[in-house]
Amino acid sequence: MSSFNPHLKFQSQAVAKPYFVFALILFVGQVLFGLIMGLQYVVGDFLFPLLPFNVARMVHTNLLIVWLLFGFMGAAYYLIPEESDCELHSPKLAIILFWVFAAAGVLTILGYLFVPYAALAEMTRNDLLPTMGREFLEQPTITKIGIVVVALGFLYNIGMTMLKGRKTVVSTVMMTGLIGLAVFFLFAFYNPENLSRDKFYWWFVVHLWVEGVWELIMGAMLAFVLIKVTGVDREVIEKWLYVIIAMALITGIIGTGHHFFWIGAPTVWLWVGSIFSALEPLPFFAMVLFALNMVNRRRREHPNKAASLWAIGTTVTAFLGAGVWGFMHTLAPVNYYTHGSQLTAAHGHLAFYGAYAMIVMTMISYAMPRLRGLGEAPDARAQRIEVWGFWLMTISMIAITLFLTAAGVVQIWLQRIPADGAAMSFMNTADQLAIFFWLRFIAGVFFLIGLVCYLYSFRQRGRVPVVVAAPAAA
């Protein structure tokens, strides 16, 4: 923040850089723990008892959530000042919150790794307000309180920025999504003793995040980048955004019912959940049409080709992961057999990567050259390396999804469909899936190589040369 950056419209946008950098560091950690878990699937005692599978999985999923949150916050700190046409309300507050959130995140992960979970719960006085022990919400209560404090400070900062500046559809949708993210997280503090009731409130956090308000955040970030790289009129893009978020909210909120099939809810949810969750691919399909339409109607050739590729890629991959693979097992008669199988893991991996990891990397790809003082785009070599990273990660994730899908089909065929006496046991079924898990691990290694390419592209210091017209002859 101390040095002037001529490539930023507002100097306070520079606070986004540490958020983006830390997000990518956590992303590397998530992938590494994913590879460890992938190997533990086929080499059961790998790193045991130093790093049990359940601990590796907890770190893997928590890193996913936290790095995406850092990415969303960095995106907001970059786009909100530009959309509001004014400086960020308090850059100093943004930096303070960064260090608070980063410290809380690192300490929590270290706690998972070096302290037995029961001891961690006792150490952090979970008995005063029990919130621990649930998937994705394993954080100690003190960490959850810290997340709420950081979220409130963050929303105050960008909210005050919006109030004193211009109001646009993009910034309003982004703010709505971020407020929803904070509000729905509050359900994490309610942990009823009744397991059926607990599952309802757990899904109010998990589902209404990833299939609800996070889609608003994704839509706003995508719209912002497309405005910048295509030059299409803002009014056209905003109309598309209205349609997309309306579909996302209607299908996403009522579509929560597909999680109510087997947790003790009334039978009507078998129909409601199936019908509305079958409509959930629509907003993702609309995003594909939106991105392709805007690129075809572009009024300028933006020099950052890599960012444009990420913008299109995130819509297509999100539609495949969240739309196609989500629909595969969302209808109640099908979900009866597929629930909790490797097919669920296939959907989860491609959906999270396509919808949220890729949109954060899209934003970083667009913003980082400016944040690093390089102008609109890095040089051609850096972009080639980044494009290699895009294709390696995306193809590898699709391969991971296909291998997990094959594993899920075999698992369902051997373990779920046969009658009780003929069904194969869980562990015996797992032995039959080893080939798919080995292939998944190999694809994961290529994914890591792609991520390294993406990160290495930012080490290039070159920039796109500016062509200056020669002076006219006298």
From Swiss-Prot:
Entry's Gene Ontology cellular component terms: plasma membrane
Gene name, Swiss-Prot/TrEMBL: norB
Protein function: Component of the anaerobic respiratory chain that transforms nitrate to dinitrogen (denitrification). NorB is the catalytic subunit of the enzyme complex. Shows proton pump activity across the membrane in denitrifying bacterial cells. The mononitrogen reduction is probably coupled to electron transport phosphorylation.
PROSITE patterns to which the protein is assigned, alphabetical: COX1 (PS50855), COX1_CUB (PS00077)
Protein's name in the database: Nitric oxide reductase subunit B
Residues involved in heme b 1; low-spin binding: H60, H349
Membrane topology: Multi-pass membrane protein
PANTHER family: CYTOCHROME C OXIDASE SUBUNIT 1, NITRIC OXIDE REDUCTASE SUBUNIT B
Predominant subcellular localization, coarse grouping: membrane
Signal peptide extent: none
A Pfam family this chain is assigned to: COX1
Organism: Stutzerimonas stutzeri (Pseudomonas stutzeri)
Any one Gene Ontology molecular-function term assigned to this protein's record: metal ion binding
Family: Belongs to the heme-copper respiratory oxidase family.
Recorded catalytic activity of this chain's protein: nitrous oxide + 2 Fe(III)-[cytochrome c] + H2O = 2 nitric oxide + 2 Fe(II)-[cytochrome c] + 2 H(+)
Induction: By nitric oxide.
Domain of life: Bacteria
Residues annotated to bind heme b 2; high-spin: H347
